A protein has these predicted regions:
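Hydrophobic alpha-helical membrane segments
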Residues: 1-278
């Protein structure tokens, strides 16, 4: 019960920041459309050029690896860039300012080189772990999963470090690991669960909305079923956007607390309790 209570307090604290600057939710929206542009830029030309057929036939494996790696890099870059913009804007709010979308984009733009470098590092780690996982057995996949989880913990604060301290991507990873170890130990606690709460909400929407949609469709209310299905889709999108925004805000608040020992919107004891000491 204490974990559930802490999780809810985290959501409410992040929610207060989001209410103060509702435009922060625009960053995940822009990031989504930018990611779709990256997908279209890579896959549509390859599809029409017949590259996929050659890769599946085994005649262009090297080309497939190169293109796949480049795709990973640019997709990571888009994600990190707009997440950096979100975190940068959230930092302004946490420091008592009143940020705008242009403020966040400006901050991310000032560190575009470091963000791209970090995207290259993250893409490299991701491809290596994925390649090993595909060739490993069940035990090996478990080990790779643990390594991936450890990597996510070690890089938890990289984005705010890049946009606030202006260091390079390698130093950003090192600094992130140092801050987590110094302040909370090396492992995230299970009660850090904004993702869990929204996962449950999304599951509930899918379960209830899906059931209602099926019932109305079976009963012959076709247009009502279509309307319900669209409503479920819109609700899932909204929940996803809010969850992404809250996670970015929480990351900024954790960084602020890790470096200053305080945070305007978060109770320090609550933030501490979301991590377990080693």
């Amino acid at each position: 019960m204490s974990r559930i209570r802490n999780s809810w307090e985290l959501v409410k604290a992040s929610w207060r920041v989001l209410l103060a600057d509702k435009e922060l939710v625009l960053f995940p929206i822009i990031s989504f459309f930018a990611s779709m542009i990256v997908v279209a830029t890579f896959f549509l030309p390859m599809l029409f050029a017949g590259v996929f057929d050659a890769i599946f036939a085994g005649g262009a494996q090297v080309l497939g690896l190169v293109v796949g790696f480049a795709f990973y890099i640019f997709l990571y870059f888009v994600t990190f860039f707009f997440n950096s913009a979100l975190v940068g804007a959230a930092m302004i709010r946490l420091e008592g300012g009143d940020p705008t979308v242009s403020d966040g984009l400006r901050i991310a733009g000032q560190h575009v080189g470091s963000i791209f470098g970090y995207a290259v590092i993250a893409a490299t780690v991701g491809m290596i772990l994925r390649a090993i996982s595909e060739r490993a057995g069940i035990l090996g996949q478990i080990v790779i999963g643990i390594i991936g989880f450890a990597w996510n913990i070690a890089t938890f604060l990289v984005v705010p470090i890049l946009v606030v301290e202006g260091v390079g991507p390698v130093d950003g990873v090192k600094r992130s690991a140092e801050l987590l170890k110094k302040t909370w130990g090396e492992q995230l606690a299970g009660n850090f669960s904004i993702g869990l709460i929204f996962g449950l909400l999304i599951f509930g929407v899918i379960l209830a909305g899906g059931a209602l949609t099926v019932v109305t469709a079976v009963a012959g209310f076709t247009w009502l079923a279509i309307t319900l299905a669209l409503l479920v889709l819109v609700t899932l999108i909204v929940l996803g956007l809010i969850s992404s925004s809250l996670n970015g805000i929480f990351t900024a608040a954790v960084y602020q607390f890790a470096t200053t020992g305080e945070s305007k919107y978060f109770d320090p004891e609550m933030v501490k309790s979301t991590f377990k000491q080693k």
